[in-house]
């Protein structure tokens, strides 16, 4: 199931809802993708270090249970929260993160951004800039509990990027961030979100089918 949450969505409320959904689900629970835009907020993951919060100003800071360091969420950015059963899909966490990144790259190609890429050792999606610098356009952060994943990824569409200057994004000093608009791609949060959710659902669905076929002894 793919659903949009009310916008702007309060981060703490959505986080609580993800935890409740994950705690209540069982082997037969259908997977879901939640799409939203958040009100401005900095989130600090489990590995987050306070020194990467340079100047948060009046923007609230939430310490959460996803992996990773600090990032910013705000209007003009789409969040895709992937509440997936990784055991049903036969995915390890690294394979799951790879799937999220591949689905994001496929979405960006659909939108006309062919040059987006990954960066070894640094999860997320990047766009090469003049001079060879890589600017981050999508951030990932996941949590897996008892084989069930939640949290997900954030894709910058057309937003005020200045709050990223108040942090070391994802724990990298001087890391530049970029959005689709700055890359010359004009689209809406709604369209980008729908395309992203479709790619995520397709990739995860294929993994589930392949796992089921393997368990049934059907040649893939």
Swiss-Prot record:
Keyword Aminoacyl-tRNA synthetase: no
Record site feature (Lowers pKa of active site Cys), residues: 136
Top-tier EC class: transferase
Keywords: Acyltransferase, Cytoplasm, Transferase
Main localization category: cytoplasm
Matching Pfam families: LplA-B_cat
Gene Ontology BP terms: protein modification process
EC number, as in UniProt: 2.3.1.181
Pathway recorded for this protein: Protein modification; protein lipoylation via endogenous pathway; protein N(6)-(lipoyl)lysine from octanoyl-[acyl-carrier-protein]: step 1/2
Annotated BPL/LPL catalytic domain residues: 27-208
GO cellular component: cytoplasm
Recorded GO MF terms: lipoyl(octanoyl) transferase activity
Superkingdom to which the source organism belongs: Bacteria
Annotated catalytic residues: 170 (acyl-thioester intermediate)
InterPro entries found in the cross-reference section: aa-tRNA-synth_II/BPL/LPL (IPR045864), BPL_LPL_catalytic (IPR004143), Octanoyltransferase (IPR000544), Octanoyltransferase_CS (IPR020605)
Reactions catalysed according to its record: octanoyl-[ACP] + L-lysyl-[protein] = N(6)-octanoyl-L-lysyl-[protein] + holo-[ACP] + H(+)
UniProt cross-references to NCBIfam families, sorted A to Z: lipB, PRK14342.1
Note: In the reaction, the free carboxyl group of octanoic acid is attached via an amide linkage to the epsilon-amino group of a specific lysine residue of lipoyl domains of lipoate-dependent enzymes.
Entry function: Catalyzes the transfer of endogenously produced octanoic acid from octanoyl-acyl-carrier-protein onto the lipoyl domains of lipoate-dependent enzymes. Lipoyl-ACP can also act as a substrate although octanoyl-ACP is likely to be the physiological substrate.
Family: Belongs to the LipB family.
Name this polypeptide is given: Octanoyltransferase
Species of provenance: Bordetella bronchiseptica (strain ATCC BAA-588 / NCTC 13252 / RB50)
């Amino acid at each position: 199931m793919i659903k949009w949450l009310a916008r702007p969505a309060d981060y703490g409320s959505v986080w609580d809802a993800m935890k409740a959904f994950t705690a209540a689900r069982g082997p037969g629970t259908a997977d879901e993708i939640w799409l939203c835009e958040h009100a401005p907020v900095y989130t600090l993951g489990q590995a987050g270090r306070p020194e990467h919060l340079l100047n948060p100003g009046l923007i609230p800071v939430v310490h959460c249970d996803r992996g990773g360091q600090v990032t910013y969420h705000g209007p003009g950015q789409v969040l895709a929260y992937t509440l997936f059963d990784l055991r049903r899909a036969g995915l390890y966490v690294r394979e799951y993160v790879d799937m999220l990144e591949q689905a994001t790259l496929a979405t960006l190609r659909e939108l006309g951004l062919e040059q987006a890429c990954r960066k070894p050792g640094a999860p997320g999606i990047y766009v090469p800039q003049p001079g060879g610098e890589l600017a981050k356009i999508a951030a990932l952060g996941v949590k897996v509990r008892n084989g069930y994943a939640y949290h997900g990824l954030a894709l910058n569409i057309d937003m005020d990027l200045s709050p990223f200057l108040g942090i070391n994004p994802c724990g990298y000093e001087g890391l530049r961030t970029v959005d689709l608009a700055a890359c010359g791609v004009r689209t809406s949060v709604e369209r980008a979100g729908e395309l992203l959710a479709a790619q995520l659902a397709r990739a995860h669905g294929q993994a589930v089918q392949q796992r089921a076929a393997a368990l049934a002894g059907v040649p893939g």
